[in-house]
């Protein structure tokens, strides 16, 4: 959405607001019409090899077009968008700024892997949701109004005025740059991951495409262009998150209001978890992972000797296959295994240590995942060790909730957003709108984690390896660490402990996991791209 003409009316001017509302409504209608058109085209036979690139390039071009249209050379417009952004759109832009690739892609995945409270050794789950949303309460009460009242341009300016001298400003600038650089790396990774999955291009090329879009969106128009780009991106993010979770909820429960009805699936998941804990096949998988872990542990006792033995085994396998005139595919696979062995003892030690830990972690009930609905690890009424573990888990949960809360309140790319408000009161209202728009997604994240886990346990566990869907192999080719399904107990059936899903995969693979049309997969990927680009815009 572009700044409509750059007219100098105040943020409260009715004609100015009406024009904004009209342009925003037209944009939303256009997005919905585009989705309907793509769904119709898919039904008419449009290949998914075209759907993915269309979603990627069209959305990036729209964002870039808004950035070019919003270009300006006025310093007031460039740094603070003329201080005339209405609170509702400021809140929408702040929500998009906050909804990074980590929130959009990984939040539901973290809840899937950690349950509601996290693992015994690492707190997590809902602590992130509570901490991040609580941070906006601190911003509304303690920070945003005071920043806007000073009428400055940047956070270092605030430190210069508040504390005086040169060093506070330099320290604030260095902290902002360090924080932004660290955070933007995750966004660029998300851009590369999504672009490579949508179009099939290499990961590095996907990163370059995303960076080009970021530059066009932010550098020509500054905060003015970024604001309206982020408003447009929030619409895509919202639709991309709510449509799949609502579709899954309707498919499983007959009601699309996922945050209100997903509790019914928690009881079913608890029953499935109990059956999996008693399953002989699951126990066999645990034993297989334990055997692997001990094998890696034995290799680490003599790394150089073990590496030489592994190389010799791989060479003999390749030689035997060639002597038998085996299938070319088998020979190529064996040759790849030989080439993929560590090059030296140092890299072998590093890899085998990592794999030993991973296998020990998976050699636990439910593949190392906690019971999803468990409040905290341990048992307040159990043994002394269980009571101690319970108290430690509670304290870790509260500590983890506090840290993101304070961290959110200090993020520089969020704080500068409230310099664009017309007044101090508008800054407070902007934070309230931010919290509302963020809550629309965050309330659905726990529901999505539960619905996806039910889908995995109900439809994927127990299926034959010969009939696994193609999307599993496609995602594994994008990034091997995202997904692994391996028949470790040799029974030919998928066990829950044999499935490893990365946190970054849960959201992106939800449409395919739930059997939704591919156009929804394209929308989810476009939403993840919008989330990454919106945060990268604000950071850069």
Where are these regions (language model features)?
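Membrane-interface "cap" regions at the ends of multi-pass membrane proteins
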Residues: 2-104, 218-221, 332, 336-369, ...
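Hydrophobic, small-residue-rich membrane helices and short re-entrant helix-turn-helix hairpins
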Residues: 10-17, 151-163, 167, 222-234, ...
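Helix-loop-helix module between adjacent transmembrane segments
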Residues: 13-31, 95-96, 100, 122-221, ...
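Small-residue-rich segments of transmembrane alpha-helices in multi-pass membrane proteins
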Residues: 32, 87-94, 163-170, 233-247
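Hydrophobic alpha-helical segments and their helix-loop junctions in multi-pass secondary transporters
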Residues: 38-40, 64-71, 180-188, 196, ...
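Interfacial loop-to-helix junctions that mark the boundaries of transmembrane helices
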Residues: 43-54, 115-130, 195-205, 386-401
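Membrane-interface helix-loop-helix modules in multi-pass membrane proteins
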Residues: 65-66, 77-152, 301-346, 361, ...
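Membrane-interfacial loop-to-helix junctions in multi-pass transporters
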Residues: 85-88, 162-170, 199-209, 393-394, ...
